[in-house]
Amino acid sequence: MKTTYVNATIVTMNEQNEVIENGYIIVENDQIIDVKSGKFANDFEVDEVIDMKGKWVLPGLVNTHTHVVMSLLRGIGDDMLLQPWLETRIWPLESQFTPQIAVASTELGLLEMVKSGTTSFSDMFNPIGVDQDAIMETVSRSGMRAAVSRTLFSFGTKDDEKKAIEEAEKYVKRYYNESGMLTTMVAPHSPYTCSTELLEECARIAVENQTMVHIHLSETEREVRDIEAQYGKRPVEYAASCGLFKRPTVIAHGVVLNDDERAFLAENDVRVAHNPNSNLKLGSGIANVKAMLEAGIKVGIATDSVASNNNLDMFEEMRIATLLQKGIHQDATALPVETALTLATKGAAEVIGMKQTGSLEIGKCADFITIDPSNKPHLQPADEVLSHLVYAASGKDISDVIINGKHVVWNGECKTLDEERIIFEASRYKRGLQR
């Protein structure tokens, strides 16, 4: 099946960050086979021609760190620091989850993400009360591209920890798929919730199965102080001593890093998922993304969970990310719009090991989203496309979402998930949680 999308303004995110006015994209099944400017001449003898009527077409956004199973917990525990927020609000509520609640919560997060333009994401879920196969089936049904990882903790007894490791290893062996729509990573929660033995076992599983690692690291000053007091090393050095960085690793946050640590992360192919809104809301601080990029670290933008954000709008994250860097460095050139867009598209895709997506180029997966600026005053005049995407647009502006060549959202309507049922069930299950 060959489909051509014509009369589009195409934000390619190729090496030149080329924006093609009045162009077209040809998709064959799940792959882009041509991207050009001008009028389509039907040289490829396509099956369908779709008129985009001047819409902006850009790569689907890539969210490098989420917790979609937590989506029911939006608005719970506002205005709290990370540790008490986790210990007194989030973990007690997650302990009440059932497989049905977990699926309903996941569906809500998936619906919000895909309708706001996210096509790929990397996720960590707490396995308590969760049917992991049901979660993976739910993500698959959404049509999204994802790395969904089972989180490991050292809570409970040593036998509990051993069982958690065994279950996580089975999960990795079942779901790791380097080139598929769904894959997974090895995901120890953090150095402050995992024992040294557990972190070492996670490193072993990652090496033996050739997977990536996903972990919260260097998120707060308290974490750095506590880990240094307990192990005599800062979190980066401690994680490295456990062997975690033997495989490409994504660290969520990286707020508290020094110059030596940034250089070390770059040398060891450790990537950073930058969560600006969540870090601000939890009072964790502001990650120095400018310094990370200058050190050669791969960085991708992320939302974290709705419980700490409180939405999954990647456009908002792009805007906050660039404004924060300009502010903390007192440098208006810090993190320009092209870089912000890169960190939410092709750069983010590279961070989570999904190089097959993130730009609109021949040979890439047909993952793209559209915005119609014609009826949106906040996107007018419409000629400064890149600027508007970062500084003016929001996820609410999305018209269409195509993932792997399939229309997942069309004219604002999600085709893969039942929006009315999902919203109803989310409210019903939320009321049943004992706060």
Curated annotation (Swiss-Prot):
A Pfam family hit: Amidohydro_1
| UniProt-listed Enzyme Commission number(s) | 3.5.4.28, 3.5.4.31
**Protein name in the entry:** 5-methylthioadenosine/S-adenosylhomocysteine deaminase
Protein's job: Catalyzes the deamination of 5-methylthioadenosine and S-adenosyl-L-homocysteine into 5-methylthioinosine and S-inosyl-L-homocysteine, respectively. Is also able to deaminate adenosine.
Q: In which residues is Zn(2+) bound?
A: H65, H67, H216, D304
Q: What NCBIfam families does the record point to?
A: PRK15493.1
> Would the keyword Zinc turn up in this protein's UniProt record?
yes
Supply the alphabetized keyword list.
Hydrolase, Metal-binding, Zinc
Residues binding substrate: E94, R150, H189, E219, D304
**Cofactor(s) for this protein?**
Zn(2+)
> Which SUPFAM superfamilies does this one have?
Composite domain of metallo-dependent hydrolases, Metallo-dependent hydrolases
**One of the record's GO molecular function terms:** S-adenosylhomocysteine deaminase activity
Q: Which CDD domains match?
A: ATZ_TRZ_like
Q: How are cofactors bound according to the entry's free-text note?
A: Binds 1 zinc ion per subunit.
Reactions performed catalytically: S-adenosyl-L-homocysteine + H2O + H(+) = S-inosyl-L-homocysteine + NH4(+); S-methyl-5'-thioadenosine + H2O + H(+) = S-methyl-5'-thioinosine + NH4(+)
Q: Which family does it belong to?
A: Belongs to the metallo-dependent hydrolases superfamily. MTA/SAH deaminase family.
Family matches, as Gene3D superfamilies: Metal-dependent hydrolases, Urease, subunit C, domain 1
